[in-house]
Amino acid sequence: SSLVNLRVFNRTMGKALKWNDEFEGEVVTSLEEAVSGADVVITCTGRDEDMMEIVFADDGLYPHLKEGAIFIDHTTTSFKLAKHLNESLQEKSVKFIDAPVSGGEAGAVNGILSVMVGGDQAVLEASESLIRTYSKNITYMGQSGSGQLAKMVNQICIAGLLQGLSEGLLFAESENIDMKSLLSAISGGA
């Protein structure tokens, strides 16, 4: 956007270039280039190990973070890692919030992600207008790590719903209930 100087880094350069074909920004080839001088750094990776590598590896972003910067992590990580990142970043006077998202790729593309935030509420308030550009629902959950705990609850609930649906459909199949009629009936009710 014209209000934000956006630098994009992806470990898979093809993904960054594809993104750049559709949106405005500057694709960079290193984490150092991505974060040097940045007021806000946003990450979203796959796992705890990915975050540890991106932040703390020899070519990671940690040494290049600007004092006073805001660091928003949208990765679904462990509570333990969120606390570790918060403590490590505080040592550099970098303000951290763990802010895992729900809504998948479609939610991101359509700007309707749900974000669960843990950390200093003042940091969320300072960055909320930016987060709102790609999300619909932003909920402050409490101290550092609380965003990750909320995401864990979200995942447990989704798993329970999927298991219940699977069990119900298996039961219907075992009783030779017409699946098309059943799905029509239950999709309109509770």
Q: PLM features: what roles do these ranges have?
A:
Residues 146-190:
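Helical "substrate-binding/catalytic lid" subdomain
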Residues 7, 14-18, 82-86, 92, ...:
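Catalytic-core regions of core metabolic enzymes
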Residues 5, 24-26, 70, 95, ...:
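Conserved beta-strand segments of alpha/beta enzyme cores
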Residues 1-43, 75, 105:
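NAD(P)+-binding Rossmann beta1-loop-alpha1 motif at the extreme N-terminus of oxidoreductases
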Residues 2-3, 93, 176:
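Glycine-centered short loops/turns at secondary-structure junctions
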Residues 31-36, 40-41, 48-113:
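Rossmann-like NAD(P)(H) cofactor-binding subdomain of soluble oxidoreductases
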Residues 77-156:
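Rossmann-fold dinucleotide-binding core
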